[in-house]
Amino acid sequence: MTIINLKNINLTRNKKEILKDITWKVNPGENWVILGLNGSGKSSLLKLILAEEWKTSGEITVLNTQFGNGEIPKLRKRISVVGSFIAERFQPNIKAENLVYTGKFNSSMLYKPYTDQELDEARQLLRQMGAKSLIGRNYASLSQGEKQVLLIARSLILKPELLILDEATNGLDLFAKEKLLKQLQQINQLKTAPTLIYISHHPDEITDIFTHLLLLREGKVIQSGKKENLLNEKILTDFYQEKVEVHRFEQKYFVIPAN
């Protein structure tokens, strides 16, 4: 099964080219980072994958569902998305495990009390993620980093085949960001671990769990492939159109402007 297969995708909006001839394939066992500066087309690409926006031309297949020939509502139940845009949708007094279980219904509201058996599933997931300390706490009492961990747990309650993290560390301080990245490592070790697509403009967030990298600039794929083949000064200088230095420290990559 192919996770994502985009062929010659173009997206035009108000006579402006947003995405230009995008071809990209994600296979099982691969975790990808989409790296690009603001305005590169990352969000538009995400909307196409989620069928929230329609391509101008090209072919899109996600989890073996070809857009135009498959059932999109069923496909959406197999995909989870985490982004800062979701964080403000929840009631401040909702308990952590209740919030996690709302993911079963793709809702931000608690329409009925959940049973202990239902909530035990949410609690067990939080324990597996190393987030046992969040159980029983109100959403409003959590830090930004803890809220993001909770939202990721919520996204996993349906056991999705594809998990997309859209700028998941936005608004997090240094320590919260590092903790969140470690949480992703734990998720990757779950028996039901989904394929990860991580959208970012920070190279230092590319950890060892990610196998591949797609470099997006001004709506075009500049390079794509195994991360170790792309995270070097020659390719990234070409990508950023500014001379950069690439340093690796403790299995992380740091890109800085060259003197």
From Swiss-Prot:
ATP binds at residues 36-43. Keywords: ATP-binding, Nucleotide-binding, Transport. Gene3D superfamilies: P-loop containing nucleotide triphosphate hydrolases. Residues 4-243 form the ABC transporter domain. Pfam families: ABC_tran. Transmembrane segments: none annotated. The keyword Nucleotide-binding applies. GO terms for molecular function: ATP binding; ATP hydrolysis activity. It comes from the Bacteria. Belongs to the ABC transporter superfamily. PANTHER family: METAL TRANSPORT SYSTEM ATP-BINDING PROTEIN TM_0124-RELATED. This is Uncharacterized ABC transporter ATP-binding protein YmeB. The gene is ymeB.
